[in-house]
Amino acid sequence: MFCAALMCARPLLAANGTVAQADALLLHGLAGHDRAEVAALLDPEFTWIAPRGKSQDRAIVLQNFPSPANATEQIQVREYGNAAVVRADRGQMHVLRIWVRRPAGWRALLYQEVLQVAKSETPGPGSRNCENPCRSIPFTPQIENEKAAIASWQGVMQAMATNDADVYARLIADEFTATDTHHARPFSKSDRLAQIQKLKQTGAHSAPPPLVSARMFDFGDTVLMIAREQRPNGKPYFNTRMWVNRDGRWQMLFSFNTRIE
């Protein structure tokens, strides 16, 4: 089911329809090693990120046919205009699939897995001044929507570094979730706000990790970023984020973080 023009900034929950059908066909093709079926559903820019951080492009996926996790789990689909977010969760394993609407139909742009730890880990220290990513990053967005999404993201990073819950709340969508390898469960917007308030009360700070590199994709009402980040002396990881243009500002929809082992 497609998003009506005036409603594209709001998520459309789809129990079935073209996105879910395309998603089911992709899983079917992967299970049967059907190269033609899978190739027809993968975007030229497609990326597959496995739970230990191994990244494969479209050509390699069509050679190796990796097995998707949680393939039989019920999916949650949210459509945002020309993009759709598919989630399949079971226990500590979480799967994200991003679909984009192309002229020929829906195509898969990203498949990513996060296997969360049984007990949450304490992240290593970041740079206290938060130069990267709060003020400058080693990546230059090319178009206006990308620039606006990056500005919003840096606003979130600054809010986290300074424990500013009000700014954080404005720039985060209500349906936001953060799914990280080093945590035992996903966190909601309210969870994150509670964490910020607790840090503020204790006088502690959480410095965001520096950005190493990024790829961005503009879909009109949404922007996707697949970033590589790394704390000093820590392991790198892929962090995928998506923003939606809603209520006159770009809000983050999710953060999906896979550590590179």
Report the location of each language-model feature:
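Short, low-complexity N-terminal intrinsically disordered segments enriched in polar/charged residues
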Residues: 9-44, 109, 115-170, 174
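A mature extracytoplasmic/lumenal domain signature
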Residues: 42, 52-53, 89-91, 97, ...
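Short beta-strand edge/turn micro-motifs at domain boundaries
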Residues: 94-132, 236-261
